[in-house]
């Protein structure tokens, strides 16, 4: 659905080192999601490469490209927030009624947390909401003992950026990217054995916040619902004709296949009760995404609920056009891998009873 001008536009931040697979992931997301997304690409050194890869994939009509793909090539995004990032975001938000969301692809050197914190600036915090930070790691490089496939190229990228004001070593940057993640995607998983994938998942999980999952990925194939805090639009809304169906159908052992569980509760709940209950539900069952709404006593607007990994956000949606039902209640959809549906339902009901 097209986002109402007064509502907050969902933002997904994608981070990871040079060559990890961020642009491949974005191309697949843009081609397969059916959403009207704007992309902010931060790159330097090999100026324009990532932006050109995204522009050339045919995800939108050519006349819309300048308004849908914005490149920042003047340095590390987290170091140029005030001078570069905020003006571009304000420019994109002038077109918020034409967009379903924004994806920010950081350079390999950006610290994710300063960027996320920038969305709290008064100029944009009432117009956007960060639905998740997705960190892409190179599974093949990690299995070979390095956090990046080409350390020399990454060091050259560091040397080419005069605006860089943090001197963290590569391993520390990797730790920062993992520490900020709500979801970690392991690229090039099709080059690894199942045993190697499991070993890397176990190794990385020790560096992550509780509840953050590590998923294998090949050629950027990940369900859009996992990355964007949005509902897929109806087919008759801003549908585009594209001749790239061949890009949509890669299937192999590392393609993410998710289970979904619908959760419903009729009765009285409160925002505080849900904010206390849902983080444990997410962590205990390894939920990757949780979304839905609740109608609460005395409230005319629904409480919208969105979570990516452990990042949970609940807010009353004054822009909702949904008609209020006659009774209070909760409607949720949980996404995850090999979900214990009955266990998820029982824990939710036990916490609400």
Where are the predicted features?
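Short, well-ordered beta-strand elements
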Residues: 105, 330-337
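Residue-level signal for short, function-critical loop segments
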Residues: 43, 139, 188-189, 338
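A residue-level signal for conserved active-site and pocket-lining positions in enzyme catalytic cores
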Residues: 43, 133, 214, 274, ...
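Nucleotide-state-sensitive switch-loop elements of NTP-binding domains
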Residues: 2-15, 20-171
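Flexible glycine-/small-residue-rich
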Residues: 41, 137, 307-309, 336
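C-terminal accessory "lid"/substrate-recognition subdomains
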Residues: 2, 151-321, 325-330, 339-342, ...
